[in-house]
Design a protein with these regions (language model features):
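Gly/Thr-rich phosphate-binding loop signature of adenosyl cofactor/nucleotide-binding cores
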Residues: 37-40, 44-167
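Specificity-determining recognition surfaces
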Residues: 1-63
């Protein structure tokens, strides 16, 4: 996919970013058909193993058994209902085992949608909550990934280079 026009517009508008954004590293769908294709690819090729490997991480494989559909969900190119229905259909047709489908649906409904619902039901006051009474700024490594804690260096570094570091 040629993302050069989008990238030129981002640069022209002076969109502030952190990390290492690059036009050829922008792998997210730009329209519904691309988002649907990403979902279909996950359901067909990855979902059958999702139950066993949904929490796996590897320093050389940033995406592993993840669906890579969060961007499409967040930008409304996909909706959670159709994502769940696609996973259910894979199980009904015998293309994915129940533990994999259950694990994926739990990530969508039991985590993503639940947390999103709590967040928006409590806004705008939720933004100001500080239950731990924390006032210190985030450490520099949060923005650079430069820390001796290997797991955090990898997770933050991956976020900076891939704009991705989570399940969905």
């Amino acid at each position: 996919h040629d993302r050069s026009a989008l990238w030129a517009e981002i640069q022209r508008c002076g969109v502030k970013t952190f990390g290492e954004p690059q036009a050829d590293n922008f792998r997210w769908p730009l329209n519904r058909s691309e988002a649907k294709a990403r979902l279909d690819e996950f359901i067909t090729h990855v979902l059958p193993q999702f139950g066993n490997w949904q929490d796996a991480m590897h320093t050389e494989e940033p995406f592993l058994f993840h669906s890579l559909i969060s961007f499409a969900l967040n930008t409304k190119m996909l909706n959670p209902r159709e994502v769940v229905a696609a996973a259910q259909q894979a199980w009904r047709l015998g293309h994915a085992p129940l533990p994999a489908v259950e694990g994926f649906i739990r990530q969508i409904l039991g985590w993503r949608e639940y947390v999103r619902g709590i967040y928006w039901s409590q806004m705008p006051g939720y933004r100001e909550l500080n239950a731990l009474d924390q006032h210190a700024p985030l450490p520099d490594w949060f923005w650079t990934g430069k820390t001796q804690m290997r797991c955090l260096a990898h997770a933050v570094g991956q976020s900076l280079t891939e704009a991705y570091a989570h399940h969905i």
